[in-house]
Design a protein with these regions (language model features):
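Short loop/helix-cap segments at secondary-structure boundaries that form the rim of catalytic
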Residues: 52-55, 107-114
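Short hydrophobic/aromatic-enriched beta-strand-loop microsegments
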Residues: 115-122
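Acidic, metal-associated active-site segment
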Residues: 82-98
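Short, well-structured N-terminal submotif of metal-dependent ribonuclease cores
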Residues: 1-35, 42-59
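Short, flexible helix/strand-to-coil boundary loops that buttress conserved ligand/catalytic motifs
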Residues: 13, 47, 75, 111-114
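Short beta-strand scaffold positions
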Residues: 35, 62, 83, 101-102
Length: 122
């Protein structure tokens, strides 16, 4: 399973080569690409065919109480962490997934709280 952050969705929408490769490989291998719902709020600005295509090919997970609490604890334990990044990492930890991001440094800082999560550049 793969989790994308906002930067990964932007890269996919802009048709960046690595993002397209990861996405196409996941689809070929029937691997779910998952994002927490809060990532959609950060990414979506208006409807476009490119965004609709991306959105139709991913799984959007709601941010419930449990995930929110874990993300909040990660924010408290990690200086400079954002809510969206913490939720992305918490979801990846919960799913046993790899995170693809354009902001490796930001998410690597959260690995102190989520040491089992692999963070890869998109």
């Amino acid at each position: 399973m793969i989790v994308f952050d906002t930067g990964a969705l932007v890269a996919l929408e802009r048709r960046k080569q690595r993002a397209l490769h990861v996405w196409a490989t996941a689809r070929r291998d029937r691997t779910d690409v998952v994002v927490p719902g809060i990532v959609i709020a950060e990414w979506w600005r208006e409807r476009s065919d490119a965004r609709e295509k991306v959105l139709s090919s991913i799984v959007v997970e709601p941010v419930g109480d449990r995930l929110g609490r874990i993300a909040g604890e990660a924010i408290a334990a990690t200086s400079g962490a954002t809510v969206v990044d913490a939720v992305v990492m918490a979801l990846a930890a919960q799913l046993g997934a790899v995170v693809f991001t354009s902001d490796v440094d930001d998410l690597e800082a959260l690995r102190a709280f989520f040491p089992a999560v692999r963070v890869l550049a998109i």
